[in-house]
């Protein structure tokens, strides 16, 4: 599907890149499966989970290279996680995902919201009884998630393609999910996976609506002032962006702030680094979301480069109807689901050791219902980070619109580094 427009070289290469990177991940995944088969003599979930305590007691080790013994459980978990890194686009196996924008926009929405990129997160959560016994693997996941979350968010700030900005935001949000897996907050990771699907599909389809209206223009610097002619698309994109930045009351707020709170409570090595990265990422997310909304829908029209046969207008109802359908859960689903998520709605297939159970600590000490969490959201650190990001974006794009050009001119090396994707 990424290579759907097969006559374009860029689309063909993007499909090939996605295929190759995922085969690298699959190598780790199949090694993990082979090790499970070797040690457990089965590939059935229930058999493996039942035999884990017995396997841990044996203290089996694997010599990765001569003179180096690693616990077999850690090697298995790390191999499985390498598979998840490719599917869920974690650094350094993330490079296929921005290029997947070569596919049609509804395909981008499908890949990023509901199918491929969530597969790795789901697999790790499903294998939680195995991962819980490897602090090494949990710590690795926490650090990798933090790196992805922060550094992929930074790349979104300099993008000019509307779809690529949303794609990098997906990478950043996947980083949050992997941080949650690393701190044993599996239910929070699945909850964010669930809420993220709605607002990410909304953002992609909203971007698609803009692209259709502008005759397939994707450069945000050739847009502007679209709120006058596309009010419904504008409202939908603002709702999606508020959920993305985690504005209190939106579905993204409940799942993302939950992950940040649980990470702060975790004792896993690397958790406090991830907490700091998550807070900085809230700031960065607000900057690039505000930038996208302002440059596309507000300010002066910059469509002189496009030759339009007719004035810009909202596309067909078939494009607008899904935006309305997705905007409702993007606001409401988080508040509805937060209580059942914390109360053990997913406890059947998930397993957490008592010493890692940050969710129970949060439930007993800090959670007093969806309304209390909403009100507390306005005095929390993530909200302050969000406000700071909003202020910086306002200064750069409304108060002093020439400031980004000055910064770009003075920081040529940094801009070159970001444009080369590190």
What residues fall within each predicted segment?
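Hydrophobic transmembrane alpha-helices and their helix-loop junctions in integral membrane proteins
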Residues: 1-311, 315-318, 329, 335
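Membrane-interface and transmembrane segments of multi-pass membrane proteins
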Residues: 313-422
């Amino acid at each position: 599907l990424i290579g759907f427009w097969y006559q374009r070289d860029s689309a063909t290469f993007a499909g090939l890149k996605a295929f190759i990177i995922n085969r690298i991940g699959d190598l780790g995944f199949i090694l993990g499966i082979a090790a499970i088969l070797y040690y457990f003599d089965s590939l059935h979930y229930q058999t493996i989970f039942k035999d884990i305590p017995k396997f841990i007691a044996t203290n089996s080790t694997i010599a990765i290279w001569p003179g180096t013994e690693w616990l077999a459980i850690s090697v298995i978990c790390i191999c499985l996680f390498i598979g998840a890194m490719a599917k869920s686009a974690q650094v350094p196996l993330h490079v296929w995902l921005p290029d997947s924008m070569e596919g049609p926009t509804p395909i981008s929405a499908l890949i990023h919201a509901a199918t491929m990129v969530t597969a790795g997160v789901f697999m790790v959560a499903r294998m939680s009884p195995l991962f819980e016994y490897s602090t090494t693997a949990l710590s690795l996941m926490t650090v990798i998630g933090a790196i992805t979350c922060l550094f992929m968010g930074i790349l979104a700030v300099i993008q000019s393609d509307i779809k690529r900005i949303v794609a990098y935001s997906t990478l950043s949000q996947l980083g949050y999910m992997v941080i949650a897996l690393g701190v044993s907050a599996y239910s929070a990771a699945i909850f964010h996976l669930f809420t993220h699907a709605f607002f990410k599909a909304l953002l992609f389809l909203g971007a698609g609506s803009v692209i259709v209206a502008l005759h397939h223009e994707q450069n945000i610097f050739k847009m502007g002032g679209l709120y006058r002619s596309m009010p419904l698309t504008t409202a939908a994109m603002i709702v999606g962006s508020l959920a993305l930045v985690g504005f209190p009351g939106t579905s993204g707020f409940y799942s993302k702030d939950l992950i940040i709170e649980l990470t702060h409570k975790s004792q896993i090595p690397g958790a406090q680094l991830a907490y700091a990265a998550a807070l900085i990422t809230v700031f960065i997310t607000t900057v690039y979301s505000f930038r996208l909304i302002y440059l596309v829908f507000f300010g002066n029209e910059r469509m002189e480069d496009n030759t339009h046969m007719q004035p810009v207008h909202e596309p067909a109802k078939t494009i607008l109807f899904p935006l309305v359908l997705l905007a409702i859960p993007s606001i409401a689903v988080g508040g509805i689901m937060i209580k059942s998520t914390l109360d053990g709605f997913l406890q059947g297939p998930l397993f957490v050791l008592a010493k890692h159970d940050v969710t129970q600590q949060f439930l007993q000490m800090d959670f007093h219902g969806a309304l209390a969490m909403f009100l507390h959201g306005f005095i929390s650190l993530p909200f302050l980070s969000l406000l700071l990001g909003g202020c910086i974006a306002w200064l750069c794009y409304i108060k002093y619109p020439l400031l980004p050009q000055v910064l770009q001119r003075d920081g040529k090396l940094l801009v070159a580094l970001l444009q080369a994707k590190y």
